[in-house]
Regions:
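Surface-exposed extracellular loop regions of Gram-negative outer-membrane beta-barrel proteins
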Residues: 1, 7-14, 48-51, 62-63, ...
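Transmembrane beta-strands of outer-membrane beta-barrel proteins
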Residues: 1-2, 74, 91-97, 159-163, ...
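Membrane-embedded beta-barrel scaffold of Gram-negative outer-membrane proteins
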Residues: 2, 227-328
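Transmembrane beta-strands of outer-membrane beta-barrel pores
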Residues: 2-6, 99-105, 140-142, 165-171, ...
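Outer-membrane beta-barrel translocator domains and adjoining extracellular loop/strand segments
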Residues: 6-13, 106-112, 173-179, 207-212, ...
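Outer-membrane beta-barrel transmembrane domain signature of Gram-negative proteins
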Residues: 15-159, 210, 318-320, 336, ...
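Residues on the lipid-exposed face of transmembrane beta-strands in outer-membrane beta-barrel proteins
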Residues: 76-82, 144-150, 181-185, 260-266, ...
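Gram-negative outer-membrane beta-barrel transporters
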Residues: 152-157, 277-280, 295-382
């Protein structure tokens, strides 16, 4: 699978580093060191990143990226059935297990590091890097379940019960149980049936929530590109900070649903109505948390003047300020909550043979309320 995107970035003059390492300090010329006036080296180039650079992007440029996907999914299922009868009660037992394996062997999002995609304006100094899908571990999902179906004949009345439980395990993530029960009983045989159900469904996260991209930030420590310095003496110094956005406390989303219904049959007419409620308090979302705010030292430099007479030599720097700077990013969370209530109905008034016409009325009503269990954050400017 392959997709392609191209756009123009405007007001894009912002710092960008090619480094993938937290704490790396690069200049705009690969491997070139930058020093303070006392000879202390400002740049910190990680091993293996000697050919990388950090620079100021132009105010406007065309960027493009490709997304290469090569999905691989496997599925296996094993089921066995047992049936029997005890007096007026018919039993049917179902036991089974299934296994799912899913992942992607593609190259993922690929772009020219000289022209990276437009940054996220919602986060100061935010940046992004290439990441291959094949570097993301495969998801292994195992499920084991059991279900018992009972049919009990009580004279002309019939009681049907189906009860089951399922255990799900996502390797490297977590597990949980999801029980459910469905029942129906004839109040008036062949005319009125009462139905009810209750169940819990566990939803495993996708790979996006299990293995999110790291949060990259490129802080511009020095930039004299807009000064009168000769081109050979214009340079930038940029510090890269990298944070793991994975949430180790993420858990399976739990959905609780119950319903109650009536089935009415009279002559050729049939009326079905069902009321239901669905509730979830830990659905998946991506948002900020108390742990995704990071205070980092932000060092700023200025040039030592006069500049070297050799225009191929850059000036040394001096530190003018070091202040704490609050960076923030998002992480997968169980913060989504919602409540759904509704009614479904289907009224079949039967066929009127005299005019060869059948009348049917069906519809539904749904009410939904959603919100977040997360804290609300905002910047207070004084």
């Amino acid at each position: 699978r392959h997709s392609y995107f191209q756009d123009e970035a405007t007001n894009a003059d912002w710092g960008y580093s090619q480094s993938m390492t937290d704490g790396a300090v690069l200049s705009n010329v690969p491997g070139r060191p930058v020093y303070l006036e006392d000879g202390t080296e400002v740049t910190r180039v990680p091993v293996g990143e000697e050919s990388l650079k950090a620079w100021m992007l132009p105010g406007s440029y065309i960027y493009m990226y490709d997304v290469y996907g090569k999905e691989l999914n496997t599925f296996a299922k094993l089921t066995t059935n047992f049936a029997g009868k005890t007096g007026p009660i018919h039993h049917r037992l179902i036991l089974g297990a299934d296994f799912r394996n899913s992942g992607n062997l593609g190259k993922g999002k690929v772009f020219d590091p000289e022209n990276p995609p437009y940054r996220n304006l919602s986060y100061d100094f935010a940046s992004q890097r290439n990441r291959a899908f094949k570097d993301i571990p495969f998801m292994n999902h195992l499920g084991v379940y059991a279900e018992e179906k009972i049919q009990w004949l009580m004279g002309k009345h019939e009681l049907n019960i189906s009860a089951g439980i399922r255990w799900d395990k996502v390797c490297g993530f977590g597990d949980g149980f999801s029980p459910r029960i469905n029942a129906s009983v004839d109040i008036i045989p062949r005319h009125l049936t009462l139905r009810g159900a209750y169940g819990i469904t566990l939803k495993a996260p996708t790979l996006l929530y299990m293995y999110p991209d790291k949060a990259y930030f490129d802080l511009v420590n020095f930039n004299n590109a807009s000064t009168s310095a000769p081109d050979g003496q214009k340079f930038q110094v940029i510090t890269t900070r990298v944070f793991d956005a994975e949430n180790k406390n993420l858990e399976m989303a739990k959905n609780k649903k119950c319903e109650l219904g009536l089935d009415l049959k009279f002559n050729k007419m049939r009326f079905f109505i069902t009321a239901y409620q669905e509730k979830c308090d830990n659905g998946y979302t991506i948002a900020k948390s108390l742990n995704t705010f990071k205070s980092v030292p932000f060092v700023q430099y200025s040039e030592i003047t006069p500049r070297p007479s050799d225009e191929s030599q850059i000036a040394n720097l001096k530190e003018i300020a070091t202040n704490p700077y609050l960076l923030s990013y998002t992480t997968p969370m169980n913060a989504l909550k919602y409540l759904v209530r509704g009614i479904d109905f289907d009224f079949d008034f039967g066929r009127v043979d005299a005019i060869r016409t059948a009348f049917n009325l069906n519809g539904s009503y749904m009410w939904r309320k959603s919100g977040s269990n997360n804290y609300m954050f905002w910047n207070k400017i004084t």
